[in-house]
């Protein structure tokens, strides 16, 4: 463009600050674009505004947020501290020679006023107190900092646009011993031989950590790699062994190990085989005079099977295993079963003899309506469903038939022994009531502690003794003052009960100490030469990528303009810019008002933006993104103006992140405690991500171990990337037609086969949205909405609730015009309100009784009565495949969950059951529940496709978005491999990097245990982990393996049903293995083979400006300076050395 007065800026110099003198003083300096009268008038109106600010680029690049040193706070102020209160901020610029860093530090530490907490923000975590984005940091002093060890970086980084950025390295935390726990004389070593998923479960972690905290015991976790791949001669030796069967566990192998090493065992491994056959369990219980319900048996398999070893054990307990012939049986009538002359009348319970088969049927008497109920492993919030066609017993397989008993209070009792003299018991709602599972915030079934009667305590002791299981769970029924055992579950712990954890640890401690005394006496009397074996595979390192915790719904308005007024806001940049500072947002608001006055664009669009920006101006996290569109001459022809707000961390985020940090600390204490000495933490610059990283870090190290560690900002790795924008836009254009009438989804779209086509689902959602809009408007007009909910999260109120929903109602008022990108906003909002505004949700969408006429247009039936549910969610995020981990020959096509999704019943009863778990089970909320279900379906099958529909698109978008992060992770793992001590690197980021990184992994060709279309929703705090293990052979040669895991995060299938407390948070689902243990070089090569598929653009993150320049002055030399990788510091800085900075200048 000609005719522009240029201000010369040296191409090798970064301006530290632009002043008012840099700004145009009159419209005569502007581009010919501005020569028409309206434009001149508009720019003359803007000119006075420009006198009040100094445009400059942000100085923040990569930076570190430091946790405070110990002792700056007392315990009583803990709850009042926010991220801002507990972080020191440093901005680091690595000099070009790489020998030192300059660190700019601001203390910014202050004690929060506890009296300032509002009723709406009981945790003192209002968003106004949370640390601002990394861009809004002012520095006041400089301090020296020793150079940090540089991670292994390869030549590939020259393609990723980050070779001038500091590598993933940060100072390591050194644990403090300001409050050391008392140390006691060492007793011995506890070996834990069980599948990792069980060993690292919450109860096991708590109990083992209690055992080792005073130094009496050390633990050795055998681990899946050793258990499955190593010979028992190479398994580590121990004094005491905790071992038990679960899916995939090689029980016979563990039995051979016990015979070889003879450790003290708390649960007899051979006797655990009894639990596989319900017939044997019942025979053992009878031998010990434990009451059980009356029963009949139909064995079509020849009876229970047992090897000689197990037969010998059973004989010791008075049970003889004999072959059994198939009995004569018949149904005398529809209600009476006869087996070998003995009869049983309905209702009765039909149980498979296989102890691992939970498909249990209950048959009801015809006089009570007939039919039956199918019980199954808990799926989401269901554990059973009624089937009116269930009349005749199954004729294939072997079954036990027990007389059905009406239990007291419709409850079952779950009992947990720790030896013969201790038993903890809890009640739960029986699954036969309505099949609805009540869950707490940890995702566990709601239970209540109950006191056992003397008779029940005696029963518990007999169960523990009969099965030779010190730790053993079993189920009781209480019927008219008597108790009956109906199932024995074997090794199991109580969940989420600290008193139980304490009791269990104390009893185990005493047991182990007594056992060690006997073992030592035996050694004295009969010296035994024991071979000592250390752990074969040692946990060496961890790279973990974590999505941020719970947030408010993200909202935005997006419009495009060609007016020079909007183009001038770019400050001459030709890439995306971001504006966050409140003063700068005020200037943009003034520009919008001027543009409205001068009709510089569609008035309706401008008015929407101006009104929204005025309301949200002071909201934390409000920002404007300006995305230029260039013509063939590389000049800006229009600007996409995007106003965003929301997406702020909620009060729940603190609890979620803290809990995850505590869990990881417990894992490290068990796997390799020395890893805590070398942990590096990185975060994107967004507030919700920083907030998560900070609370996770504090919990990981403990309040008494805060040191000088840093949370380092890595925008280049973890912030939004524009590199895949064009490709993602193309994919989004493909998604729109799929939602239109008559369009069938392509095969790779993976739409559930038995669901109506996407258009019909969208159409129904639009109908439901229109219906609920009328209800909400009616209730706002006729009811006192301010009294519906007394406490609000994140400073909301009824008007803001209505504003959010009104925006969604406009987006979903026409099935032909629904934008696929709005589906995530709908699902986001619905999930948020189900957790944080449930009381208001219930009241504002209450259609009233009797139902009003507006309900007639919907009809009385749902679109479908069976909804797709993720296979992993169906199995409670457990991989139910006993062979998958033993059969290395299986490829990914046979991996668990290859079908991905199955249909589950979504029917609800027509009348609310008094024992029902949720107010939303009432018929008047049938449409609201349907809306939630259908929004979930659309979210699951539409939103992940924004990152690619075809495999090629998924890989390309994945690489363009997360290639720098993927490369850095491999560099980190290589660095860990070469270290003598273990290490951990944690990356905190947002959803897009989680999905795209997973797509890279899946497209790399690494054999996976979970098919990609079986991956569940990746919710808040979802994680991807790379675990590194090391083995050293006799010659000193080292081998390394990698195992990939993932967690779906803080997820619930049914947010309307989960029972909440005031914290409104859902716990994190434990990690599940994506792969077996694989050779490290193999994994790295598989991933690197895909890296060369794309070439990263020289710049792929948005410019962040602190003050928009409304003059639209073209500055070619400035753009030139932005594009270079090495920029010299001005001479005034006192250094002539070049500075290596991030290519992205803010």
From Swiss-Prot:
The modification Phosphoserine is found at residues 31, 54, 77, 895, 1107. Residues 16-25, 125-144 have a biased composition (Polar residues). Keywords: ATP-binding, Cytoplasm, Cytoskeleton, Kinase, Nucleotide-binding, Phosphoprotein, Transferase. The keyword Repeat does not apply. It catalyses: 1D-myo-inositol hexakisphosphate + ATP = 1-diphospho-1D-myo-inositol 2,3,4,5,6-pentakisphosphate + ADP; 5-diphospho-1D-myo-inositol 1,2,3,4,6-pentakisphosphate + ATP + H(+) = 1,5-bis(diphospho)-1D-myo-inositol 2,3,4,6-tetrakisphosphate + ADP. Residues 96-106, 164-178 have a biased composition (Low complexity). It is found in: Cytoplasm; Cytoplasm, Cytoskeleton. GO terms for cellular component: cytoplasm; cytoskeleton; cytosol. Substrate binds at residues 197-198, 377-378, 414, 428, 492-495. InterPro entries: ATP-grasp_RimK-type, His_Pase_clade-2, His_Pase_VIP1, His_PPase_superfam, VIP1_N. GO terms for biological process: inositol metabolic process; inositol phosphate biosynthetic process; regulation of bipolar cell growth; regulation of microtubule cytoskeleton organization. Residues 110-120 have a biased composition (Basic and acidic residues). Bifunctional inositol kinase that acts in concert with the IP6K kinases to synthesize the diphosphate group-containing inositol pyrophosphates diphosphoinositol pentakisphosphate, PP-InsP5, and bis-diphosphoinositol tetrakisphosphate, (PP)2-InsP4. Phosphorylates inositol hexakisphosphate (InsP6) at position 1 to produce PP-InsP5 which is in turn phosphorylated by IP6Ks to produce (PP)2-InsP4. Alternatively, phosphorylates PP-InsP5 at position 1, produced by IP6Ks from InsP6, to produce (PP)2-InsP4. The N-terminal kinase domain produces inositol polyphosphates. The C-terminal acid phosphatase-like domain binds inositol polyphosphates and negatively regulates their accumulation. The C-terminal domain reduces the amount of inositol pyrophosphates in a dose-dependent manner in vitro. Belongs to the histidine acid phosphatase family. VIP1 subfamily. This is Inositol hexakisphosphate and diphosphoinositol-pentakisphosphate kinase. The gene is VIP1.
